[in-house]
Amino acid sequence: MKKLIWLFVFAFMPLVIFSQRNADYGVFGGVASYFGDINTNKILYSPRPAAGVFYRYNLHQRHSLRANLFAGGLSANDADFNNSFQQNRAASFSGMVAEMVLQFEFNFFPYSTDGKKWNSTPYFAGGIGGAFIDTKEVAVIPVIPFSFGFKINIKRNIGLEAEYGFRKTFYDNFDGLESYPYAWTHNNDWYTFTGICVTWKFYKLAGCPAYNDVDSKRKR
C-alpha cells in the first residue's frame, strides 16, 4: 500500500506544481456499497460512509485527467435477502476499501470553474487504479473505475458535482464466499462510490489562449 501511495505522489507532483492554472482540487463525501455473491443486484445496498480527495488537471474544457484517493466502508448480510439459499447460508462481512485511481474525464459540454457562473455539464470518466481491501482478508488489487455525474459552477472558481462511480475488480473474496454461479457480476466482486464533490481553485493565474479557445468562441 505504501508503494502505491508513493507512486501516486511522484506521478502527479509535477502536475500539481506546474499546472495550477488548469487544476481543480476537490473533496468527496457520500457512501460506498458492494456487489458480489451476497448482493447480486441491489443498487446502493447497505450504504456505508465514504470520503475522499482528488486532483483534476484540465487538458481542455471537455477533457481532464483526474487522480482520486477515496475510502469507504463495505458490508453485506445474507439475512437482508428473502431467498431460502441465502437465509440458510447466513454469510456476512464488514470492512473497508481505500483506492487510488487515475481517470480520463469527458465533459459533454465545455466546462470551466473560472469562467461563466452556472456553467454546467454531465460527464463520464474511466481509467485504471488500485485498491486496498480489508474485509474477509487483506489484499491490494487492481480495479477499473468508471464514473458518471453532473457538475455545475456555482461560484467563480467553485464547482459542485453529483457522482456515481462503480469499480470492476479482479477479486472474488470481499465476502469470503466461493463464486455464486448466477451472479450478474461474472463471479468477481464490485464496489461503488456515490456522493457529492466540491471543487475549487486556490488562485487564478493568467489565462492560456489554447485552453480558453472554446469559451471565447461561445461568447462571440
Where are these regions (language model features)?
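Transmembrane beta-strands of outer-membrane beta-barrel proteins
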Residues: 23-27, 65-67, 100-102, 120-126, ...
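Gram-negative (and chloroplast) outer-membrane scaffold detector with strong preference
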Residues: 61-136, 200-202
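Repeated loop/turn-to-beta-strand initiation elements of outer-membrane beta-barrel proteins
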Residues: 23, 62-65, 112, 156-160, ...
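Short glycine/proline- and aromatic-enriched beta-strand/turn motifs that initiate or cap beta-hairpins
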Residues: 19-56, 199-205, 220
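Residues on the lipid-exposed face of transmembrane beta-strands in outer-membrane beta-barrel proteins
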Residues: 27-31, 53-57, 102-106, 126-130, ...
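Predominantly the C-terminal beta-signal and adjacent terminal strand-loop region
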Residues: 78-79, 154-220
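Outer-membrane beta-barrel translocator domains and adjoining extracellular loop/strand segments
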Residues: 37-42, 78-84, 115-117, 135-140, ...
